[in-house]
């Protein structure tokens, strides 16, 4: 019994000695490295400021590997980085049109929908929008207003390993040559004073602030044409 007790004590001591020592720093190995993230955020603007003074832009394909990829327009549908001007609307806008206006599979269903079904799309019923709008790719945007109300410079060209990329913005504006330049369509002019105005939304774009720091910021661009009303009687 005494020999067996000695053997158990020796095995327990050996097990304790063989266990690895864990310091308090091992807890920092789990999850993202906050220290490295903070250093990256500080080093990127410094690099950008340095290269801006030299007159050229850095290679962003290594810093932002997904920025120049094919899926970039899925992250920011109204902002596109491309070597040439896009020939059509963003993919998300095309997919939305496909969902809203699906083509019937056969002639029978086409005839049923044309005979007055509720599933007929608005455009096929002859309905018109209150304000005429037009979608355009803006290729020469120089400045914009960010979410803090500051005027920032929009980067027009970015150098990458595959060549220069330009920023294009898909904006929706009020049609200057449309029939709603003097008021909204379908509004009683005797009761209301109407006007079609551009509505702006925020998108992310690569910009330069007043301190010459480059970064992704929220800026305002035209994204819709809406109708504003003013009562002729109460002026409200």
Curated annotation (Swiss-Prot):
Disulfide links within the chain: 131-196, 174-225, 184-227
Residues modified by glycosylation: 47, 106
Cited InterPro entries: Cystine-knot_cytokine, Nerve_growth_factor-like, Nerve_growth_factor-rel, Nerve_growth_factor_CS, Neurotrophin-4
Sequence intervals crossing the membrane: none
Keyword Cell inner membrane assigned: no
GO CC annotation terms, alphabetical: axon; dendrite; extracellular region; extracellular space; synaptic vesicle
Keywords: Cleavage on pair of basic residues, Developmental protein, Differentiation, Disulfide bond, Glycoprotein, Growth factor, Oogenesis, Signal
Signal peptide range: 1-18
Keyword Glycoprotein: yes
SUPFAM superfamilies the UniProt entry points to: Cystine-knot cytokines
GO molecular function ontology, one term from the record: growth factor activity
Positions of the propeptide removed during maturation: 19-113
Distribution of this protein across tissues and organs: Ovary.
GO BP: cell surface receptor protein tyrosine kinase signaling pathway; modulation of chemical synaptic transmission; negative regulation of neuron apoptotic process; nerve development; nerve growth factor signaling pathway; neuron projection morphogenesis; oogenesis
Family matches, as Pfam families: NGF (PF00243)
PROSITE patterns named in the record: NGF_1, NGF_2
Function of the protein: NT-4 could play a role in oogenesis and/or early embryogenesis. NT-4 interacts with the low affinity NGF receptor and elicits neurite outgrowth from explanted dorsal root ganglia with no and lower activity in sympathetic and nodose ganglia, respectively.
PANTHER family, sorted: NERVE GROWTH FACTOR NGF -RELATED, NEUROTROPHIN-4
Family from the record: Belongs to the NGF-beta family.
Designated name of the protein: Neurotrophin-4
Species this protein is from: Xenopus laevis
Lineage: Eukaryota, Metazoa, Chordata, Craniata, Vertebrata
